[in-house]
């Protein structure tokens, strides 16, 4: 414990020494000179979020929205399963009723790849659309964001906007077309964020595009769409909300993130925890704790499923600006290196570890590890999840939160760790290798992590109970 305390004190002292920022817009009177590396911590954060409209049946307004935007030629993106279901039919009826011409693209892949992104991009380029509508879960919304971006910047190479170090991570400076997102799952919060995630097949890792410029113009959050979701989809989507909230709330503060951008356009979408994101994260976590189990166990519980739909958006607002960290960074190779595992109640023809499941399975180990920094926040979140924290010691915050998470997952019959997905200790080097490129998110973790640390976290996540 003494070593942990010393590490925390050292970290905080470094934070205090580096919080001032030498920026063109920052008064030199109150700033300090950069350190030897030339890097200083940021001094500001931004809140960027899509317009959100919530209400049962609100999807039927989409045609009027597009008409108000002056759209005449719209791309409607969805997947094969949803294309025959009510959410898409309602959108098509609304478009037709309001005289909006549209083409349907229903080849979105669940857990998209660079290849499936490029197929959608090619469709968008050929269509010369003046607006987009995405109806589906995170896979559909992310695919539509990418299609809009690259159709609006037709001469860009695919890796130009992909996050470094896999891509070039260029800032988006071209104007995009309006995009309306209609989420049908309660997990990714993609209707609120400027992030599009995909599997980069060449390296077998997940990466993405992160820019405020690609966030949807409008998100239509209609709780009626949640009633069609299978129970396992509700659970795994809810785990994504859970970890979005936990990770954004326990991420390093924005004022500890460095370097400070020399130009505001270079400020990353994921900036670190901040006072506004904190509010959304805590509120989302409270909803998850109260309603997720109900939403999973009773498909007809409209109240619970409606609350989870809101929680997804709330957590999206939080993490879309604060960011996520280790659970998500480690989840990408878990999904990308899947062997034969196929999740129940997912109608796919390929092995699949749902994103929310890949994220939550490492959460007990991760938060045990990160709680050395900001233990008060870890203990607070454990209390929200139902742990008795009145007599808990602050130094046990990570263990208390980990136990609360294990109980929460056990109550929902979650697979017993990575081993249940087909992974073994022999896979750990590959899982670590797949995590290392995820520095955009892992650097927001409250504790730095070595390869040995990551190996230990994966090993601890092989079994949960």
Curated annotation (Swiss-Prot):
Entry comment describing in which tissues the protein is expressed: Expressed in white and brown adipose tissues, liver, and kidney. Expression is differentiation-dependent during in vitro brown and white adipogenesis.
Modification sites for Phosphoserine: 450
Modified residues (N6-acetyllysine): 443
Any one Gene Ontology cellular component term annotated for this protein: mitochondrion
Location in the cell: Mitochondrion
Pfam (any one): Fe-ADH
EC number: 1.1.99.24
Main location: mitochondrion
Gene3D superfamilies, alphabetized: 3.40.50.1970, Dehydroquinate synthase-like - alpha domain
The entry's keywords: Acetylation, Lipid metabolism, Mitochondrion, Oxidoreductase, Phosphoprotein, Transit peptide
Domain of life of the source: Eukaryota
Induction: Down-regulated of 40% in white adipose tissue of ob/ob obese mice.
A single GO BP: lipid metabolic process
GO molecular function, one term: hydroxyacid-oxoacid transhydrogenase activity
Disulfide cysteine pairs (residue numbers): none
Catalysis performed (reactions): (S)-3-hydroxybutanoate + 2-oxoglutarate = (R)-2-hydroxyglutarate + acetoacetate; 4-hydroxybutanoate + 2-oxoglutarate = (R)-2-hydroxyglutarate + succinate semialdehyde
Record family assignment: Belongs to the iron-containing alcohol dehydrogenase family. Hydroxyacid-oxoacid transhydrogenase subfamily.
Primary role: Catalyzes the cofactor-independent reversible oxidation of gamma-hydroxybutyrate (GHB) to succinic semialdehyde (SSA) coupled to reduction of 2-ketoglutarate (2-KG) to D-2-hydroxyglutarate (D-2-HG). L-3-hydroxybutyrate (L-3-OHB) is also a substrate for HOT when using 2-KG as hydrogen acceptor, resulting in the formation of D-2-HG.
PANTHER family: ALCOHOL DEHYDROGENASE, HYDROXYACID-OXOACID TRANSHYDROGENASE, MITOCHONDRIAL
Name of the protein this chain belongs to: Hydroxyacid-oxoacid transhydrogenase, mitochondrial
Encoding gene (name): Adhfe1
């Amino acid at each position: 414990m003494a070593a942990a305390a010393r590490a925390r004190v050292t970290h905080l002292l470094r934070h205090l020494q580096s919080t001032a920022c030498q920026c063109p817009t920052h008064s030199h009177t109150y700033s300090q000179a950069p350190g030897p590396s030339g890097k200083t911590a940021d001094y500001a954060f931004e809140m960027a979020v899509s317009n959100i409209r919530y209400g049962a049946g609100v999807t039927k307004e989409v045609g009027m929205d597009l008409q108000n935007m002056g759209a005449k030629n719209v791309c409607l993106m969805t997947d094969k399963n949803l294309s025959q279901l009510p959410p898409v039919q309602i959108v098509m009826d609304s478009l037709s009723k309001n005289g909006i011409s549209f083409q349907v693209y229903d080849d979105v892949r669940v857990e998209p790849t660079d290849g499936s992104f490029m197929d959608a991009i090619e469709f968008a380029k050929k269509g010369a659309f003046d607006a987009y509508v995405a109806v589906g879960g995170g896979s559909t919304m992310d695919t539509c964001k990418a299609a809009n971006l690259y159709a609006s910047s037709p001469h860009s190479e695919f890796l130009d906007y992909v996050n470094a170090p896999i891509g070039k991570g260029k800032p988006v400076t071209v104007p995009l077309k309006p995009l309306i997102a209609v989420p049908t799952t309660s997990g990714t919060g993609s209707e609120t964020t400027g992030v599009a995630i995909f599997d980069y097949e060449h390296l077998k890792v997940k990466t993405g595009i992160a820019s405020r410029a690609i966030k949807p113009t409008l998100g239509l959050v209609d709780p009626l769409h949640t009633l069609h979701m299978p129970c396992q989809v509700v659970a795994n989507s809810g785990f994504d909300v859970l970890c979005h909230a936990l990770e954004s709330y326990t991420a390093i503060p924005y004022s500890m993130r460095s370097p400070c951008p020399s130009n505001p356009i270079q400020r990353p979408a994921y900036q670190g925890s901040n006072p506004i994101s904190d509010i959304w994260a805590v509120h989302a976590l409270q909803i998850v704790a109260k309603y997720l189990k109900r939403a999973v166990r009773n498909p007809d519980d409209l109240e619970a499923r409606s609350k989870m739909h809101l929680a997804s958006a709330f957590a999206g607002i939080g993490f879309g600006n604060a960011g996520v960290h280790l659970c998500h960074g480690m989840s990408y190779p878990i999904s990308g290196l899947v062997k034969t595992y196929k999740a129940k109640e997912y109608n796919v023809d390929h092995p699949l570890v749902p994103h929310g499941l890949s994220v939550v399975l490492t959460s007990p180990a991760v938060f045990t590890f990160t709680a050395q920094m900001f233990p008060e926040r870890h203990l607070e979140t454990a209390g929200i999840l139902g742990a008795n924290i009145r007599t808990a010691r602050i130094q046990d915050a990570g263990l208390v939160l980990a136990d609360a998470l294990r109980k929460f997952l056990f109550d929902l019959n979650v697979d017993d760790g990575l081993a249940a997905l087909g992974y073994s200790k022999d896979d750990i080097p590959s899982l670590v290798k797949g995590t290392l490129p995820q520095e955009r998110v892992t650097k927001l973790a409250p504790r730095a992590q070595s390869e040995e640390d990551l190996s230990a976290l994966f090993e601890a996540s092989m079994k949960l109970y």
